[in-house]
From Swiss-Prot:
It is an enzyme of class 3 (hydrolase). Its EC number is 3.1.21.-. A motif (RCR-2) lies at residues 66-68. It is found in: Host nucleus; Host cytoplasm. Residues 17-120 form the CRESS-DNA virus Rep endonuclease domain. GO terms for cellular component: host cell cytoplasm; host cell nucleus. Residues 255-269 have a biased composition (Polar residues). One of its GO terms (molecular function) is DNA binding. Pfam families: Gemini_AL1, Gemini_AL1_M. This is Replication-associated protein A. Belongs to the geminiviridae Rep protein family. Implicated in enhancement of V-sense gene expression. Acts a an inhibitor of C-sense gene transcription.
Length: 314
């Protein structure tokens, strides 16, 4: 049976730390056989010399199965990998079973079937401080919360463990625990992946962009064209005009005359000044261009010789 540690919930966290000779695991909604789970845990902690492993199947309220595992070893099992105890994609709730007696009694309260190996070693130190046991010392709230922070692997598990260990504080200070949960286990932001393949140069799907331009910027409906052109009276005429404009606007039309390449320079015209003003008054015209032949229309008129007319009678 392989150990899977690649799921989101089992990603190694720098905050996670487990170190204890008694390990209590709960696999929620796990259909695996207790024997297979127990054998896997036994081989998994072989480095720390296992002495007892109990694997119990329990029926949940929704009809599914839970697996509880109590693992005891001669040396403390130490790991900072929250996915260390994962089995075939199933991630357990991991706790330090400081009161092995209570944990074993809890796991065996209503078993469907179970598997165990080795010799159970009773422990008298209670995780929450059991006053019924002799020489027991009640654990402080700081120690309880510290242990929860070290063993929780996600936000939901952290709040659930707080609720079980400190119910009054959970009910009266839930907003503070939720804040600390968000800080301990921040949401992982998804990396954006473009749906379009990379191109050269790196453009984003020019075909889709061109289609958008055609439908939004370069398209005019016949009805809108008729409103802008009152002389267009029918939809057929408007459609015909739009088709013509569409084809014409995408066809290079020759200008009809080539660009001038002559290096000759025109003479610079004289700027207006006193001389020009005098010409305007006297009626003279100053030519600023090349000489031209001007034809002046003349009309015949009767001229009289210059003579002295004496008034009077002979």
């Amino acid at each position: 049976m392989s150990t899977v540690g690649s799921t989101v919930s089992s990603t190694p966290s720098r905050r996670f730390k487990h170190r204890n000779v008694n390990t209590f695991l709960t696999y929620s909604r796990c259909p695996l056989e207790p024997e297979a789970v127990g054998l896997h845990i036994w081989s998994l902690i072989a480095h720390w010399t296992p002495v007892y492993v109990l694997s119990v199947r329990e029926t949940h309220e929704d009809g599914g199965y839970h697996i509880h595992v109590l693992a005891q070893s001669a040396k403390p099992v130490y790991t900072t990998d929250s996915g260390f105890f994962d089995i075939d994609g199933f991630h357990p709730n991991i706790q330090s079973a400081k009161s092995a007696n209570k944990v074993r009694a809890y796991a065996m309260k209503n078993p469907v079937t179970y598997w165990e190996r080795g010799t159970f070693i009773p422990r008298k130190t209670s995780f929450l401080g059991d006053s019924t046991e002799p020489n027991s010392k009640k654990q402080s709230k700081d120690d309880i919360v510290r242990d929860i922070i070290e063993h929780s692997t996600n936000k939901q598990e952290y709040l659930s463990m707080i609720q079980k260990a400190l119910p009054y504080e959970w009910a009266t200070k839930l907003q503070y625990f939720e804040y600390s949960a968000n800080k301990l286990f921040p949401d992982i932001q998804e990396i954006y992946t473009s749906p379009f393949p990379q191109s050269t140069p790196a453009l984003l799907d020019p075909t889709a962009i061109n289609t958008w331009l055609e439908n939004n910027l370069y398209q005019v409906s016949p009805s809108a064209y008729m409103l802008a052109n009152p002389s267009c009276l029918t939809l057929e005429e408007a459609t015909s005009d739009l088709i013509w404009m569409h084809e014409t606007s995408r066809t290079l039309i020759p200008t009809g005359s080539s660009a001038c390449t002559s290096s000759g320079q025109q003479e610079q015209a004289s700027p207006p000044g006193p001389g020009a003003w005098e010409d305007i008054i006297t009626g003279r015209t100053t030519s600023t261009g090349p000489p031209t032949t001007r034809t002046q229309n003349t009309t015949s008129s009767t001229t009289y010789p210059s003579s002295t007319v004496h008034a009077g009678s002979n």
